[in-house]
Amino acid sequence: MANEFINFEKISRKTWQHLHQESQPPLNENELNSIKSLNDRISIKDVTDIYLPLISLIQIYKKSQENLSFSKSIFLQKNISNRPFIIGVSGSVAVGKSTTSRLLQLLLARTFKDSSVELMTTDGFLYPNAVLSSRHMLNKKGFPESYDMERLLDFLDTIKNGQSAEIPVYSHEIYDIVPNKSQIIEVPDFLIIEGINVFQNPQNNRLYMSDFFDFSIYIDADSDYIENWYLERFATLLDLAKNDKQNYYNRFLKLGEKGALDFARDIWKDINLVNLEKYIEPTRSRAELILHKTKNHKIDEIYLKK
């Protein structure tokens, strides 16, 4: 990390863990395992060392947002409707965004006991495979142009103005938008938005998704580690698809284990790595906080915007 992070405070794991008064984490091992992604690694110690201090920090930002909103209402001499505190979570494919997002949802719900906490992913705003195919963009799935960004920005504007909204649902099992299915997002107190593209907007250079965020997190790691995690996840998904002909990953079983992993390695190199280096990683300095991972998904450093 070079001059890109001149505006960040670098904090070691050891220092970070002491920024929160030691207490019992509000979940047990079974609950933690139930929210953990396929090949992610996270422990109760990680919750105590990393995520409880993070929740304390989010409390500070939440209080600041409430104070600012109240002061604005006085200045403008009008009531401002309740708006959700929006948290963006970004990072590469297979870096552990889903685990972090689900853990944040659980911890926030148990810290702010009278608050509602919703979680959504930007996958639902991918164009359906049929649309991508008609535009010869299937091999660009996950790249900025494969998302309906205008629809996503409209959704954020609706939510930020205190109104409920309906969003499409994406399934990793069928690798496509689920037809005739949607998720209703009411007006929560907290909304966590997870996606590789949450700091990007290729269609409107004047407006970024991050303009709607009250707090944002980027999960960072060396690309060699992420490649290994991606291949581990692919192998696990293959195994889970063995008895399910409808599962998207079932089709790769005919390649054999080595052939399937060679295919996954090519997908990583030709698509996911290119997307990471060209579009995802360059946006990380837009985050308020960067969680840096090393081997085995261990968070060793935290970068907090000054």
Curated annotation (Swiss-Prot):
Annotated catalysed reactions: (R)-pantothenate + ATP = (R)-4'-phosphopantothenate + ADP + H(+)
Biochemical pathway: Cofactor biosynthesis; coenzyme A biosynthesis; CoA from (R)-pantothenate: step 1/5
Organism, scientific name: Streptococcus mutans serotype c (strain ATCC 700610 / UA159)
SUPFAM superfamilies reported in the protein's UniProt record: P-loop containing nucleoside triphosphate hydrolases
One Pfam match: PRK
GO cellular component terms, A-Z: cytoplasm
GO process terms (BP): coenzyme A biosynthetic process
Entry's Gene Ontology molecular function annotations: ATP binding; pantothenate kinase activity
Protein name: Pantothenate kinase
Subcellular location as annotated: Cytoplasm
The keyword Nuclease is annotated on this UniProt entry: no
Family per similarity comment: Belongs to the prokaryotic pantothenate kinase family.
Annotated NCBIfam families: panK_bact
